[in-house]
Structures are given as structure tokens and as C-alpha cells.
Amino acid sequence: MIVINKEDCIRCGACQGVCPTGAISVKPEDVIYCDMCGGEPKCVEACPNDALRHEDITLEGGIKKKKITYSPEKCDKCGECVKVCPPGILKLVNDGKASRVPLEGFCVLCQQCVNVCPIEVIGIEGVKEPARVEIKIDKPIYIVDCVGCGLCVPECPVNAITLPKYGESIEIDEEKCIKCGICAQTCPWNSVYISGKKPQKSSRTIENFTLDKEECIGCNTCVEICPGGFIEPKSDLTVSLPEICPACGLCEKLCPTDAIELEVKLGPAKPVTEEGIVYNDENCKFCGRCALNCPNEAIRVVSPKGRVFPGLKKVDEKESYTICTTCGACTTVCPTGALKLVEVSKKVNGETVKRNRIQYNPSLCDKCGNCVDVCPYGILKLTDDEKLPVKGFCILCEKCIDACRFNALLIK
């Protein structure tokens, strides 16, 4: 069975892209895959028609392992296998057509995922151990093995990142950096670490990745520059682009004839903070009580049923939680000084400590909207309220903590 080192996985999705049976699903928060239930697949046990079987396969070197085989002609689509699948990766294909293979999500041990992983964090039990990335993060801003793609540069809300040249390492101005962690979440190669922690990656969708064969001159610059080796040269003096990759864009940026076009949509940043109001996603039930009690709408919650708090508007979104982390990005671009980052005294574990809060003077605000544009989490907004024309910033009142019944919020 395959084994994935989820901790060091960069969530590029290449394994998902090459898996012929849909047995891997890569998400920002997790990697879900068929692990054959540790050697005793429950789907095989549950199948009443012997459509799923556990059979021997001989790997390179004569090593014998097990794989799952599937006989579509025996399958009656009863769904018993789907019900018992522990990771929830098995699914019946219901596309309205007579599908040739109506079941997806079982591992056939083809090893394509192992071969394609650019950092070798996918292995096979007893054959090849998944690689472990050993790094010592000893600085608040830590950069290692940066490929110089520059993807993080335009995402920085305070313009603290510069890239001298594509292919060279980025530089981060420690005086400007507000430790929001967006660069680390955006980095497709796990080269940036902020505040000593590994980030949860932002979602990344490749909307367009194409090659203009008429413009391609077969120079192989893209082949040589691709950090993961995803691009392959072809005999007709063009190249073959992958369906899924980290989408760093180095190939597009360094192509001398502009023959490559790449369009990537990044998902929203995740609030990151270890001081002030801290959110524990494991305890959160997305009930929205915190958002309803926040006096300044500095929290936005989407419930499992698609209701947004505050406001109760119905939206077509998955459950999510967004909170102002008092990162201070808004204060750095405010031209009038209406928004300021100030320190207040708070009690934390019996000790009095200084913590940041956002201070706002409406009389100085000219409603320019710079703060809204720069907010890393999209929580700030302009309002029609003359008394409070900007909302969404945390004043550290702690009412959200008092409202939460599940200990998902606390002050540190």
C-alpha cells in the first residue's frame, strides 16, 4: 500500500492528477487516499458480488505486495463498498452516462503517484519510505530552497517581498513584514515559514495551462527550470505540460517566446496568529455565535448549511471561519491615520501582557478603501454608517470568547 507523509506534502496535486482510479484527493487541509485499510481493505470484505478483490502484485525487485482489482461487469452499484470506506475516498460514478468503470477511489498500486511526487513524500510500505523534510526553523522569517517563482510577491499585503530576478531567492523586509503568513500559504514549494510554523496551504486551481506550439522553439528552458521536473521535451521540438503541478509559473515567466500561458486562481488566506484572539479549528462547530456577538463584524462564519454569520444570508460556500488577526496591514496603508495598531494590557494565564488591537478614529477616515483592498483576509469593509464607515477590525473586546461554547477561541 502507498504511504504519504502528509506533514511535508506541498499539496501540489500532481499525485491526484496521475492517479488512474481517483484514489487520491489533495486538499489544503488534508490528503485523502486509499491505504487499503492497512492491508485488509474493508471494501473487498463488503462487496457482495466479488467485484472487488485483493490480489498479489510483484513489484520491482521481486517484492510481493497486494493491490485492489475491480471487475465492473460484476458490480451492481449497491454502494456497500462506499459506505465502509474509512477515508471516504471510494465513490460511485454517476455522470448520467453508462460509465465503463462506475467505481473510483481504489488503489491498484500502479506507483504513478510515487514516481510523480516532486519531493518524494509518497512511498510504498516496506519498499520505499516516504521522504522526510528535515529543517530547523530558527528565525521568525525563514526562507529555504526558494525557486524564485515570485508567486508570493504580489500576494504580500504590505509589499515586504522583493524578487531580484526570476530563479533567484526572494527577500523579505523584516521591518515591513507583519507576519500574516500569506507568503507561506501561497508558496507552492514550502520555501517560506513565518513565526516558526508550517502553514496550511491556500487552495490553488489551474484554470488554464496551455502551450502555443507555433511559438515554441524547442529550447527546453521550461524543462530545465521546472523545479519538479513536470515538463517533458517532445520529439517534435515542443514540450508536454502536466495536467496538475504546483503551478509556480516559472516556466511561463522564463519562456523566451511567451509560448506558455498559465492562469491560477488562489483560494483565500487563512488567519494565522499566536497572540491575541487565537482560533482553534478542531473545536469549532461553525455555529456563528462569536460572529453574532462581535460588535464590529470582525468575524465571518459560514455554517455547514451555508448560512453566513452575521446576517444569516444563504451562500453557496463550504463551512469556513475568518477572523481579524490584528496583523496591522490596514494601518500601514491608511493615509489619514484613522487606523492605528496600538497595544493594550490583557490578562493571559494570570499574567498581564501587551497585545495588539486596531484603533479607529472615524473622524479622520476619508473612506478611500485602501484598508479594505489590503486586508489579507477580506474581513474589512466600507459601510454606509457615518458613525462607523469601516468595520471588520478587532478591538480585542473578547466578547467572541465569552460567546463561544466550545472553547474554539481564547486569548494568548
Curated annotation (Swiss-Prot):
Note accompanying the cofactor annotation:
Binds 10 [4Fe-4S] clusters.
Q: Which domain of life is it from?
A: Archaea
Molecular function (GO) terms for this protein are: 4 iron, 4 sulfur cluster binding; electron transfer activity; iron ion binding; oxidoreductase activity
Q: Which residues form the 4Fe-4S ferredoxin-type domain?
A: 2-29, 30-57, 66-95, 96-127, 138-166, 168-197, 207-236, 237-265, 275-304, 311-344, 356-385, 386-412
What SUPFAM superfamilies does the record point to? 4Fe-4S ferredoxins
Instruction: Please give the cofactor(s) recorded in the UniProt entry for this protein.
Output: [4Fe-4S] cluster
* The entry's keywords: 4Fe-4S, Iron, Iron-sulfur, Metal-binding, Repeat
Q: Which Gene3D superfamilies match?
A: 3.30.70.20
Q: Where does [4Fe-4S] cluster bind?
A: 9, 12, 15, 19, 75, 78, 81, 85, 107, 110, 113, 117, 146, 149, 152, 156, 177, 180, 183, 187, 216, 219, 222, 226, 245, 248, 251, 255, 284, 287, 290, 294, 324, 327, 330, 334, 365, 368, 371, 375
A single Pfam family it belongs to is Fer4
Q: What PANTHER family does the annotation carry?
A: ADENYLYLSULFATE REDUCTASE, BETA SUBUNIT, FERREDOXIN III
Task: Write down what this protein is called.
Answer: Polyferredoxin protein MvhB
Organism field: Methanothermus fervidus
The beginning of the lineage is: Archaea, Methanobacteriati, Methanobacteriota, Methanomada group, Methanobacteria
What gene name does this entry carry?
Answer: mvhB
